[in-house]
Regions:
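A helix-boundary/hinge signal
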Residues: 1-392
Length: 392
């Protein structure tokens, strides 16, 4: 979602409104959470009064002691904050972000800020929130910049949580003037980014150099293998490390983007060298081809993943989500932009489409290889049903 919105901003025409994206990093200040704010927030969200009282009892029953010469002394009763070791704390902390969500929605309803329009007369996005990472979208002018600052100041004052400005960055659409950029950067006190900044561990922009954008995956695999290289590992332990650590860590990125085949091959080369015990420049004989090792153990292989095929299967899962989860924001955004008059199965590739969309189409092609699909047929007032039967 974030990638698609930033791509839309990057490709906007000069004659449209200019927009900016503010990537916020909220500090995890568990000890700054105001109890009164959390209590009132739960009440506004419609929680039962008995439930609210139970939650507040859990928060207010905490006491602390200070060790003096190894002996606990005193009994401190806190008036704010939530315990980091409490299993409830992460969920209560996430509830607090609903306050920011409400402030942004109210500002949008009042016309104080305007979200990014992803297509003509279509859906507009003002913010995306995930854990302590947030993306805010608005027009790149001082009026809306001041409103965003006001919202953040209200939120910080009520909750006690602070914006980590050292990790907060700005991105502007092409149509934003140089003067407007300078004024907004000065007002917010955060730097501007251009390319290859990450959001939730993934690159926010992917240009023509796909390998450059995703080369961090190979570097991460290489560092992990280097840390294991000096240790003595049996073949069984190497198998476990490859399957449960190296190949499992690739799942997140491969589930969103199509990784270049050359990069997949280079990562597989690193895995092969580790499997056969090669260290540094010392060469080892590879007794079995990689294609054979990716086969199931039932047919003589090792059950390692073919990374290119694994990538395609994960992208097919995203296409399947677009096919069936039609109430999600994920579906609404992509349908409005790419297949508003059809379904994902009939959608055509767009020259101006984002790399995320092109990657999903690769997964869609996998579904088409193993599915029978028929469009809706209309006979008078009778509309036939869609048929999509997986036969493989």
């Amino acid at each position: 979602m974030a990638f698609e919105t930033l791509h839309c901003m990057q490709k906007q025409n000069a004659n449209t409104h200019s927009y900016m994206a503010l990537k916020l990093d909220m500090s995890k200040a568990y000890d700054h959470v105001e109890w009164s704010f959390l209590e009132e927030l739960m009440r506004k969200m419609g929680f039962n009064e008995r439930w609210i009282n139970l939650m507040m009892m859990c928060l207010k029953s905490v006491t602390y002691s200070v060790l003096v010469n190894g002996e606990p002394c005193g009994m401190i009763h806190p008036t704010r904050g939530i315990r980091q070791s409490d299993p409830l704390s992460p969920f209560l902390f996430l509830l607090c972000t609903e306050g920011l969500n409400g402030l942004i929605k109210q500002a949008e309803l009042n016309g104080d800020i305007h979200g990014v329009s992803l297509c003509r007369k279509g859906l507009k996005l003002t913010h995306l929130l995930f854990a302590d990472d947030s993306l805010l979208f608005c027009r790149s002018n001082l009026e809306e910049c001041d409103k965003v600052l006001e919202i953040l100041n209200i939120y910080e004052g009520a909750l006690g949580q602070k914006v980590n400005r050292s990790k907060t960055v700005l991105f502007f659409s092409k149509s934003t003037t140089t003067d407007a950029r300078a004024q907004i950067k000065e007002a917010l006190g955060v730097p501007e980014i251009m390319h290859y900044e990450k959001y939730l561990g993934l690159p926010s922009f992917v240009g023509r150099g796909k390998k450059v954008s995703f080369n961090y995956i190979k570097e991460r695999v290489w560092r992990k293998l280097q840390s294991w290289e000096g240790k003595l590992h049996s073949q069984a332990s190497r198998e476990v490390l490859i399957k449960s650590v190296i190949q499992a860590n690739l799942t997140y990125t491969m589930g969103c983007f199509k990784i270049p085949l050359g990069l997949c091959h280079e990562i597989e080369v690193l895995i092969k060298k580790f499997w056969w015990g090669q260290r540094g420049d010392r060469r080892k004989i590879h007794w079995l081809k990689w294609d054979e090792m990716t086969k199931s153990k039932m047919v003589g292989g090792m059950g390692f993943r073919d990374l290119a095929l694994f990538n395609d299967s994960l992208l097919a899962k995203q296409a399947f989500r677009l096919l069936h989860n039609q109430d999600s924001l994920f579906y609404k955004v992509f349908k409005a932009r790419y297949f508003h008059n059809s379904s994902i199965m009939e959608a055509a590739a767009s020259r101006m489409g984002s790399y995320a969309w092109k990657s999903i189409l690769k997964g869609r092609d996998v579904l088409l290889c193993g599915a029978h699909w028929k469009k809706k047929l209309k006979f008078g007032n009778i509309i036939g049903c869609q048929v999509n039967i997986l036969h493989k």
